[in-house]
Amino acid sequence: MTTPTQKLSDAGVSIWLDDLSRQRLTSGNLQKLIDTENVVGVTTNPTIFAAALADGESYREQVAELAAADTSVDDAVFRITTDDVRDACDLFAPIAEATQGVDGRVSIEVDPRLAQDADATSAMAQKLSQTIDRPNALIKIPATEKGLPSIAATVAEGISVNVTLIFSLERYRGVINAYMEGLERALENGKDLSTIHSVASFFVSRVDTEIDKRLDAVGSSEATALKGKAGLANARLAYQVYEQSLDTERWKRLAAAGANPQRPLWASTGVKDPSLPDTLYVTELVAPNTVNTMPEKTLDATFDHAEVTGDTVTGTYEQSAEVLDAIAEQGVSYQEVVAQLETEGLQKFDASWEELLSTVRAALDAAR
């Protein structure tokens, strides 16, 4: 029998796990998910690493070595996280080779405290890439307005990028433009475009959570009927933007030079509203050449009972635009929501980074 995760894979969706820890690597758990649930990549973020480090057992030996060498907290965090990502890259190397670098990818985020400093973000992206030193690493850069030049600069150096925290269609267009600009500069720099890969991480459930809260405040029957629809509509329209970008002369010139398209990646796919199906943001966002990164709970639910019926995105654009228009008619501002979500997203990563630093600081102090 074909499993739901295999059906997703057959439909052109790459399944990535939105989690990483040393325990997951050393126990064989990640390899098991690769073997049984069609996992072909991993995404990480500061929140994930903060949770991993909170379970200190797997890191005790390395923390003791770092403490003995009088390593600073920032350097210790850098060493620990890049070591985990390098090991994960090695685990996924066969998949990366089999897919010519499309999958088998492991993402690591630049220090979120640098999100509003383009030059510092670009420098950190280069440092991460050089330190991990694996062709299947993806460097995550937030899609803030100030992050866009960093994306172009990083791609221009031949570094593969995961652009994260995308909430709005307008910002997504800016991300696509930054990727193409980076590829054009990489070509001028004599880089081999076929070795550069990118995904654009478009967040889904957080859009529903915020818009649904505002629809509840409106309280009309029309508003209630629109709940749980904004995230999917927004993501589906993002896929239309992606398709349109591939139809431009600018992209066709780059593709002829060997460039890889920047695939849409659906992030924030864990369902927050218990009244909605737990695989909603998986089964309703099936489209060719996409990635869905899932927390393990969503991955397991998908493997267990998701009903995958093929492409659920292509051809939904008019209907999706009508959903967003109807939400606007209820007095809910799309621009306000996406701006708020970007700000909150950065704040969450900042808080997680501080938590990560605090955890490592305490571990270093205990080992000294």
Curated annotation (Swiss-Prot):
Q: Where is the active site?
A: K140
Q: Name one Pfam family in it.
A: TAL_FSA
Record the organism.
Kocuria rhizophila (strain ATCC 9341 / DSM 348 / NBRC 103217 / DC2201)
GO-annotated cellular components: cytoplasm
Keywords, ordered alphabetically: Cytoplasm, Pentose shunt, Schiff base, Transferase
Question: A Gene Ontology MF term for this entry?
Answer: transaldolase activity
Instruction: Provide one Gene Ontology biological process annotation.
Output: pentose-phosphate shunt
| Catalytic activity annotation | D-sedoheptulose 7-phosphate + D-glyceraldehyde 3-phosphate = D-erythrose 4-phosphate + beta-D-fructose 6-phosphate
Q: Which Gene3D superfamilies does this one have?
A: Aldolase class I
Relate the protein's function as given in its record: Transaldolase is important for the balance of metabolites in the pentose-phosphate pathway.
Q: In which pathway does it act?
A: Carbohydrate degradation; pentose phosphate pathway; D-glyceraldehyde 3-phosphate and beta-D-fructose 6-phosphate from D-ribose 5-phosphate and D-xylulose 5-phosphate (non-oxidative stage): step 2/3
User: InterPro entries from the entry?
Assistant: Aldolase_TIM (IPR013785), TAL/FSA (IPR001585), Transaldolase_2 (IPR004732), Transaldolase_AS (IPR018225)
What is the designated name of this protein? Answer: Transaldolase
Where does the record place it?
Cytoplasm
Q: Which family does it belong to?
A: Belongs to the transaldolase family. Type 2 subfamily.
